[in-house]
Amino acid sequence: MTLPEFFGCTFIAFGPPFALFVFTIANDPVRIIILIAAAFFWLLSLLISSLWYALIPLKEFLAFGVVFSVCFQEAFRYIIYRILRSTEQGLHAVAEDTRVTDNKHILAYVSGLGFGIISGMFALVNVLADMSGPGTMGLKGGTELFFVTSAAQALSIILLHTFWSVIFFNAFDTNNYIHIGYVVFSHLFVSLITLLNANELYTTTLLINYLVTILTGVLAFRVAGGTSRSFRKFITCQ
């Protein structure tokens, strides 16, 4: 059963992001480059977080590392925002589809998905490697829900990073500091809540994280200009 669980959890975590990539990014080279660049910047934030966690006192407290990791991620989200905004004219000149620069929310969406995919991969890839077989006993006989929960958490963080970038980029464009604060503090909140998984409170963390994901998705939809009317047209394929 290890191999079916491996594929099941892989599709739970990366199925929707892969579909987003195929249908909205894969046919545009500029979007692919932006996605890869965003993933690279997230890796830089992870590198700095690792160095900080290794060198600074209090590193025995995991929450300490989580807080600074979130701060570094948001700092690099701002850096890529500044880079994309400063290179819009160049992107417009080389882009086959000019919507990528004409609609600023597309840049935010693509970079956010890049952030999310690489974050989800680093969160889940070791777990996927362990579940692919052969079967092993947990050190303390952990619950069988661990793998599915990890996959669901990874999907949540991928979607959240996508939504956060849409909100974050627009907030700086419009000087909306409330939305900037929402992105930073909801990222902190979701990350710290996952620490409860150490006590096997999986139901609690999943419910809270997906509630935040839904609320953040609605906010990102409204920020991007979505309305209830446009949502109904989307659902009914009009």
From Swiss-Prot:
Q: What is its main location?
A: membrane
Task: Spell out the subcellular localization from the entry.
Answer: Membrane
GO biological processes: amyloid-beta formation; membrane protein ectodomain proteolysis; Notch receptor processing; Notch receptor processing, ligand-dependent; Notch signaling pathway; protein processing; protein stabilization
Q: Mind telling me which residue stretches traverse the membrane in this protein? A: 6-26, 32-52, 53-73, 105-125, 152-172, 178-198, 201-221
Q: How does it sit in the membrane?
A: Multi-pass membrane protein
GO molecular function annotation: protein-macromolecule adaptor activity
**Entry keywords, A to Z:** Membrane, Notch signaling pathway, Transmembrane, Transmembrane helix
Q: Which residues form a coiled coil?
A: none
Note the superkingdom of the native organism: Eukaryota
Which cellular component appears as one GO term in the record? recycling endosome
Q: Which PANTHER family is this protein grouped with?
A: GAMMA-SECRETASE SUBUNIT APH-1
Can you state the subunit structure given in the record?
Answer: Component of the gamma-secretase complex, a complex composed of a presenilin (Psn) homodimer, nicastrin (Nct), Aph-1 and Pen-2.
Tell me the function of this protein: Essential subunit of the gamma-secretase complex, an endoprotease complex that catalyzes the intramembrane cleavage of integral membrane proteins such as Notch. It probably represents a stabilizing cofactor for the presenilin homodimer that promotes the formation of a stable complex.
Name the family: Belongs to the APH-1 family.
Protein name, per record: Gamma-secretase subunit Aph-1
Q: Gene symbol?
A: aph-1
